[in-house]
Amino acid sequence: MGKSLIQQRRGKGTTTFRAPSHRYRGAVRYVPLNLVQERTLRGVVEEILHDPGRTAPVARVKFEDGTKKLIIAPEGVLVGQEIYIGPEAPIAIGNTLPLAKIPEGTYVYDIEGVPGDGGKYVRAGGTYALVVSREKDKVIVQLPSGELKAFNPMCRATIGVVAGGGRLEKPIVKAGKAYYIAKARNRFWPKPRGVKMNAVNHPHGGKEHHIGRPSTVSRRAPPGRKVGHIAARRTGRRK
C-alpha cells in the first residue's frame, strides 16, 4: 500500500503543518473607520517589535483615547514619535490618511482595498507603492509589481516605506539558516520533488527519475493520484 502524499497529510491539520500563530504579535489593522471619519487621532509609538509572522517589524502605538494598536512600522520611525490617523493628518512618515488627501508622487504602504477593511495591500518588508494620479472617483496607485491599480479615494494608506528592507540582500549561504527561516513559521521544509521519491511515496517516484506516465491527471482523480498537472488544458512551453 502506498504512502500518503504531502497534501493529504497537510489536509489533516496536524501541528506539523499548522502555523504557530500563538507566537505572532497579533492582528495589524487600522483604527475602525467610524472612529476617525470626522476627526484625527494622535498617537505615540511606545515600542518597535519583531513579529515572527511578518517580514516587517511592527510598532505598538498608544492613542490619545487610551487604545493601543499595532501598525506596520515604516522606515525611520522612532520610539516616542507622534503619528496621526485621520483625514486631517499631516503629510509625514507614519501618518495614515485617505488616498484622496495624499499628493501625487508620495510613497505609501498598507493600502485598504475597500474603505474600512483595515489594510490589505503592500505590507511586506521594504515594499512601497506610489500615488500616480488622483481623480474625482478614483486614485491610481503603482504597486510594487508595477501594476497600476485604481482605488476608492476613501481607502486609507500610510505614508512611507515599510521597514525591514534589504533582508533579501544578505545571502542565506547554508541550509541550516534556511531551516530556521522555515521553522519560524512552521513551514514544511525541505519539500522533496515527487520524482526523487520512491514509488511507494509518490505516483511520480521510482529509480528511473522520470514520471513514466502522463503528468496530466483528471479533476476527479482520487486524492492519492491527484498530482501533477491537474485538469490541465495544455502543458509545456508556450510557443
From Swiss-Prot:
GO molecular function per UniProt: RNA binding; rRNA binding; structural constituent of ribosome
Annotated region described as Disordered, given as residue ranges: 200-239
Pfam families for this protein: Ribosomal_L2, Ribosomal_L2_C
rRNA processing as UniProt keyword: no
GO biological process terms held by the UniProt record: cytoplasmic translation
Amino acid composition bias (Basic residues), ranges on this chain: 222-239
Cellular compartments per GO CC: cytosolic large ribosomal subunit
Database matches in NCBIfam families: PRK09612.1
Subunit text: Part of the 50S ribosomal subunit. Forms a bridge to the 30S subunit in the 70S ribosome.
Function: One of the primary rRNA binding proteins. Required for association of the 30S and 50S subunits to form the 70S ribosome, for tRNA binding and peptide bond formation. It has been suggested to have peptidyltransferase activity; this is somewhat controversial. Makes several contacts with the 16S rRNA in the 70S ribosome.
Alphabetical list of HAMAP family matching this protein: Ribosomal_uL2_A
Family: Belongs to the universal ribosomal protein uL2 family.
Name of the protein in its database record: Large ribosomal subunit protein uL2
Native source species: Thermococcus kodakarensis (strain ATCC BAA-918 / JCM 12380 / KOD1) (Pyrococcus kodakaraensis (strain KOD1))
Taxonomic placement: Archaea, Methanobacteriati, Methanobacteriota, Thermococci, Thermococcales
Gene designation: rpl2
